[in-house]
Amino acid sequence: CDRYDFKVLGKNAIIVFPKKFTPKNKWVWRAEFFDAFPIVDLDLLEQGWALTYIGISDMYGNDESVEIMRQYQEFLVNAFDLEPKATIFGFSRGAFYAVNYTAKYPQNVGCLYLDAPGLDILSWPAGRGKSFGGQGTPADWEICKNVLGLTEETAADYKGSPKFHIAELAKADIPLILVQGDADIAAPMEENAQLLIDNYEKL
């Protein structure tokens, strides 16, 4: 496989090409933590999928990050002749980007893969839902509030967390793969993935 690290849209980006592409030049987009637990990524590379990432860490799925993602996808499709629709892998906080992007631009996404997703900033990084054991991360919470223009008081009214876009995901009828362990103390299942499960069943 060939890996290329480059800058685009003012951000660090990575793309890894398989030895031989699938017939449709399929690709998977790691929304966050590019090198973490790469079992699925490596398997897809072996099967002929490209793998990519753009560094929008610490933007918490805000509108600017979603627009960077749209522009990055347009760049990838045009520059490398990739399939027009992305398969997006949202691991942990990567779900902030993966879900919010898919909700706004469902026509650009062919499949959404979520692994231990964070779906509510009040669960993580705020750590406010402590009845389920979520610890939060104070330093990240300060960054999050600053990026989103929130205070401790206004954070409770913030509607940009992925959990508020679940109905839009269901309406888009995009294939969704959800992987979750029940011992996650950073983003407890009950405050995050379970919201997705419960609401999808209702919708």
Q: Residue locations for each model-derived region?
A:
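Short amphipathic alpha-helix adjacent to the substrate-entry channel of hydrolases
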Residues: 36-52
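N-terminal cap/lid segment of alpha/beta-hydrolase-fold proteins
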Residues: 1-23
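Alpha/beta-hydrolase active-site loop
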Residues: 60-81, 100
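Gly/Ser-rich "nucleophile elbow"/oxyanion-hole loop immediately N-terminal to the catalytic nucleophile
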Residues: 71-92, 106-109
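Hydrolase active-site cap/lid region
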Residues: 100-152
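Short beta-strand element of the alpha/beta-hydrolase
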Residues: 24-33
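Glycine-rich nucleophile elbow surrounding the catalytic serine of serine-hydrolase chemistry
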Residues: 90-100
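The feature captures the conserved acid-bearing segment of alpha/beta-hydrolase catalytic domains
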Residues: 134-192, 197, 201
